Design a protein with these regions (language model features):
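Functional transmembrane alpha-helices
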Residues: 2, 124-135, 244-268, 273-279, ...
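Small-residue-rich helix-interface/hinge motifs
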Residues: 3-122, 422-444
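Internal alpha-helical transmembrane segments
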Residues: 10, 14, 21, 32-34, ...
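Primarily interfacial, aromatic-capped hydrophobic alpha-helices that serve as membrane anchors
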Residues: 62-68, 460-480
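Juxtamembrane extramembrane loops of integral membrane proteins
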Residues: 112-116, 132, 175-236, 262
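PDZ/PDZ-like peptide-tail recognition elements
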Residues: 142-174, 207-259, 316-318, 327-348
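Hydrophobic membrane-targeting alpha-helices
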Residues: 154-162, 420, 424, 468-475
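PDZ/PDZ-like domain segments forming the peptide/carboxylate-binding groove
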Residues: 159-203, 243-279, 283-286
């Protein structure tokens, strides 16, 4: 429960910050060009809200008018020339509020199709969005995306300035990598040290390493001190590598004990720091990764025969200590743990940045993250990629189990880039849809009709809702164990 609360709090903190600043981007340019903003809300306020500068949630719930908003009589003339007098709210400034539905936020700009379409047939006013020059309307619409993208670059820069960049150079991983069955069929061998591909050189063990492998035709490795070239015959995608279990590749870590956890099978069996595990149930253990694979197989056997769980969890372990081999028998924990941490044999490298240095470095890293994200979107259009789509549950699960400001800000920056990119897509109801119509107007000199714009907004909104439903449905199905 504690982990769930920590992840949830981090998720809402990040989303609130990103939504607030996104809407402030629209708000800033609207105010800069003299456009009225009727409402500015963090989260949606369907029927009622939590807080408002001139309204109360009780009045909103019971559809009562706000007390403090004055009205005035306005005479309107219809298409037949008939006049009528109506009561209209006077503009008393922007209503700032906090909604209750955390699916986003909004900035109600006067004179926009999707914000005040009930006023489109009325006489225009100089403070309305629709009467402003095209270039001003364009800046108002891209303001949110621009702020989100610049925010991501700034966060990356400050992360580099505060924590630097810590990584292990791939070519210094002296024990090499270990591969799953698919990797071994391609020609890789456990212990291979990755050098380069025809696409570039391996530098760090991160997502870019997998991208290089996925795009490569040839991979050069150091095997037993000799450079060896492997020609990939299998068209393995990045998605295949990420989803494979056991992993397509991982750093090879010796099965040597660094520390024994208290009150665990390892402590009860007398295992100590420095012991090297040689086998489990007679199966040779050459690395910590291979140990985890054998433990996973034990879990599979328990799933097939749950009644024999205690018997299956009883394992025989052979280990070496000071050149002497010995054997113990112990019972794994319910979550199939022995109870020790392995020695990590690699020394990380940390590159530190001054404040000025961090700015271009953060900008460069942000551009790289955006380019990688756009490139990875091609997998969404595959069957497996569509299944991998996730909603709020998936996003929340990406945050760390414990409070870690470093990882929190990295995740927030990534979400900011995703939010910026998704909003600039040319889909009506999103910022990109408005930008598309404005660019059309700038090129042709003709503005799309209001009727067309309204219909396009409805279609775009429907598409976005369907996409959100599917993404969150995937989360539910995964939670229920159907995916």
């Amino acid at each position: 429960m504690e982990i769930f609360l920590i992840k949830t709090l981090q998720f809402f903190m990040a989303i609130s910050l990103l939504v607030l600043l996104h809407e402030l981007g629209h708000f800033f340019f609207a105010k800069l060009f003299g456009v009225r903003v009727n409402r500015f809300y963090l989260f949606f306020n369907y029927r009622f809200h939590i807080a408002s500068t001139y309204d109360t949630w009780v009045r909103r719930l019971f559809h009562l008018k706000p007390e403090v908003v004055p009205t005035r009589e306005v005479t309107e003339t219809d298409d037949n020339g008939k006049t009528k007098t109506v009561q209209e709210k006077e503009y008393v400034g922007t209503e700032y509020g906090l909604g209750w539905l955390p699916l986003g936020g909004y900035c109600a700009i006067d004179g926009m199709i999707d914000e005040t379409n009930q006023k489109l047939s009325e006489e225009t006013h100089p403070w309305e969005f629709r009467v402003k020059p095209t270039w001003q309307r364009l800046l108002i619409m891209v303001g949110g995306v621009l702020v989100n993208f610049l925010l991501a670059l700034f966060i990356y820069a400050m992360v580099l300035y505060t924590w630097g960049e810590t990584y292990v150079p791939v070519q210094q991983m002296s024990y090499g990598m270990e591969f799953n069955e698919q990797g071994r069929q391609m020609g890789f061998r456990d212990g291979d040290i990755l050098l380069r591909t025809n696409e570039g050189e391996f530098k760090k063990f991160d997502a870019d390493l997998f991208r290089l492998l996925a795009d490569a035709n040839e991979v050069q490795v150091l095997r037993d001190g000799t450079a060896t070239t492997i020609t990939k015959s299998d068209d393995t995608s990045l998605l295949d590598m990420i989803k494979s279990d056991p992993p397509f590749l991982r750093p090879r870590i010796p099965a040597v004990i660094d520390s024994v956890l208290p009150a665990t099978p390892a402590e009860e069996a007398g295992l100590r720091k420095g012991d090297r595990l040689a086998s489990i149930n007679g199966v040779e253990i050459v690395s910590f990764g291979r140990l985890t694979e054998q433990l996973a197989k034990i879990g599979d056997r328990i799933s097939e025969m749950p009644a024999d769980s205690m018997k299956i969890r009883r394992v025989t372990i052979t280990y070496e200590r000071d050149g002497i081999t010995d054997t113990i028998t112990t019972t794994l924990t319910a979550d199939l743990k022995i109870g020790f941490s392995p020695v990590y044999p690699y020394t990380p490298t940390t590159e530190e940045y001054g404040f000025i240095e961090s700015l271009p470095a953060g900008a460069g890293y942000g551009w790289h993250v955006l380019a990688s994200y756009v490139d990875d979107l091609k997998y969404v259009f595959s069957a497996d990629g569509a299944k991998s789509l996730g909603g709020f549950g998936t996003i929340g699960s990406l945050f760390p189990d414990t409070w870690d400001w470093h990882r929190f800000w990295l995740m927030t920056a990534l979400l900011s880039i995703i939010l910026a990119f998704m909003n600039i897509l040319p889909i009506p109801a999103l910022d990109g849809g408005h930008v598309l119509f404005l660019l059309y107007e700038m090129v042709t000199g003709r503005k799309p009709s209001d009727q067309f714009m309204v219909r396009a907004e409805y279609i775009g909104f429907g598409f976005v809702v369907i996409l959100m439903v599917l993404a969150n449905l995937n989360d539910i199905l995964r939670w229920l164990g159907y995916m």
